[in-house]
Design a protein with these regions (language model features):
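Peri-transmembrane interface segments
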Residues: 226, 239-242, 253-287
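Alpha-helical membrane-interface segments at transmembrane helix boundaries
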Residues: 10, 14, 42-45, 49, ...
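Transmembrane alpha-helical interface segments in multi-pass membrane proteins
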Residues: 3-10, 14, 18-26, 33, ...
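Short juxtamembrane loops and helix-capping segments at transmembrane helix boundaries
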Residues: 55, 350-382
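Short cytosolic juxtamembrane segments of multi-pass membrane proteins
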Residues: 3-4, 400-415
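Mid-to-C-terminal secondary-structure elements
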Residues: 126-143, 152-253
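Hydrophobic, regular-secondary-structure patches
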Residues: 42-120, 127-131, 145-146, 163-164, ...
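Generic structural signal for small/hydrophobic residues in well-ordered secondary structure
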Residues: 16, 44, 62, 90, ...
């Protein structure tokens, strides 16, 4: 049976070569549109998410604010200024906090030989490395607990600021001046893309132990606290607990949202994922419409085939062919047509994606750094295959139903 179906299929292709080729091209192009749009969209979404997480990975940044409500006999409008001990206080009082770091911040002048440059410097603890994804490159390290305890004059640099200062020299182990105070470089951050600017790009940032920062500059108040909940889904509860604990210490209403400012990267991540899903749905819809137009072409070819083979169908039915056989014959031809065009489209898309993924993400190709690499995922393959099968089935079903419903006597008269 299947051999006969294949034979009839290729006979129809030869009989309607031009129409069949145009239909195959349309299906191929539609498949390419769906696969490439989804793959590039997924790659872009992954890269944008990576860039956002590189500025803050599941963290909340807590800033001191100004009270907006009267509380316990105190007027509103009082400033709330946090100190580094608040980090320990919150860590002890809120078990659902996984990591927390005080954060001092100011502009400093870095000098090496005759070269000097001004950049932002932060005083933090070792948790900052993971929370801000500031991972060291080879032969270097981030700050550790001993650096904090001993108030060591050590510095961790972003790759761009390090290159500006040291050019082609290896900075690790080198001494430089930070506002005329000698520091030793212990590590250089790995290059990373950062789409959310948290007080400037990390590639141009200098980082030192918060204890050293406080000793060097005499800061009393921290600029902010970085907090990572152990369970990101509990961020609202952690926020409430932060307001409760600090409200008790600084005597403000725990419901006073103006007393503290919180930059919630977890919520931003959720919103970004929803936006990414919306973009993927839009791109799929565009590709699907292209593929749907190709499906109309398949249906058109099948209707022409049914019309031209009406006499043949009548003969088959007159000698005992069942309607189910006639139905399956034309559905098979439509599905096989979609399969050939879809396979060609898949192979072409795979070639394009493979070629694009071979392009290096060097410093000179900024577009690739932000667009990311296209991802040909299993979900994309299955979704495209499912759409192709559905379009092929629908494109073949209605012409096949028409073929199976013809009257054998009338069809034998058809020329």
């Amino acid at each position: 049976m299947y051999f006969e179906l294949l034979r009839d299929f290729f006979q129809d292709l030869r009989a309607h070569r031009t129409r069949a080729i145009l239909t195959l091209v349309a299906i191929t192009w539609g498949t390419v549109a769906v696969v490439l749009l989804l793959s590039f969209g997924e790659g872009l979404g992954d890269q944008m998410m990576k860039g956002m997480l590189n500025a803050g990975d599941r963290i909340m940044i807590v800033y001191g604010g100004e009270t907006g409500l009267t509380f316990d006999g105190l007027p509103k409008g009082r400033r709330v200024r946090m100190v580094e001990d608040d980090a320990d206080l919150l860590a002890r009082a809120i078990p659902s906090i996984d990591m927390i770091s005080p954060q001092y911040r100011r502009n400093v002048t870095l000098s090496y030989g005759k070269f000097s440059v001004t950049t932002e410097c932060e005083g933090v603890n070792p948790f900052f490395e993971e929370m801000r994804r500031m991972f060291p490159s080879a032969n270097g390290r981030f700050l550790n607990e001993i650096d904090v305890l001993e108030q060591r004059r050590v510095l961790f640099l972003g790759p761009e600021i390090a290159k500006d200062i040291f050019n082609e020299e290896d900075p690790v182990g080198k001494a430089l001046m930070v506002d005329n105070i000698p520091f030793t470089v212990v590590g250089i951050m790995q290059k990373k893309i950062q789409t959310a600017m948290n007080n400037g790009p990390d590639v141009r940032r200098a980082v030192m132990p918060y204890s050293t920062f406080k000793t060097s500059y005499g800061n009393i108040y921290v600029n902010s606290l970085l907090v990572r909940p152990s369970d990101p889904s509990q961020q609202d509860r952690v926020k409430s607990e932060i307001f409760r604990v600090l409200g008790s210490k600084y005597r403000f209403d725990p419901t006073d949202e103006r007393a503290l400012g919180i930059w919630d990267f977890i919520e931003a991540e959720k919103i970004s994922r929803k936006v990414g899903l919306g973009v993927s749905i839009f791109l799929f819809s565009v590709g699907f419409l292209t593929l749907l137009i190709a499906g109309v072409g398949v249906a058109n070819v099948m209707y022409v085939v049914v019309k031209e083979r009406t006499h043949e169908i009548g003969i088959k039915m007159a000698v005992g062919a069942r309607r189910s056989y006639i139905l399956s014959q034309f559905i098979f031809e439509a599905l096989f047509l979609a399969f050939i065009g879809g396979s060609a489209g898949m192979l072409f898309s795979y070639g394009v994606i493979s070629a694009v993924r071979m392009i290096p993400m060097s410093d000179g190709i900024n577009a690739m750094q932000f667009l990311g690499r296209p991802v040909l995922s299993a979900a994309t393959m299955m979704m495209t295959t499912g759409v192709l099968a559905a379009i092929g089935l629908l494109a073949g079903f209605f012409p096949a139903r028409k073929a199976a419903s013809v009257d054998p006597v009338e069809s034998l008269r058809y020329e």
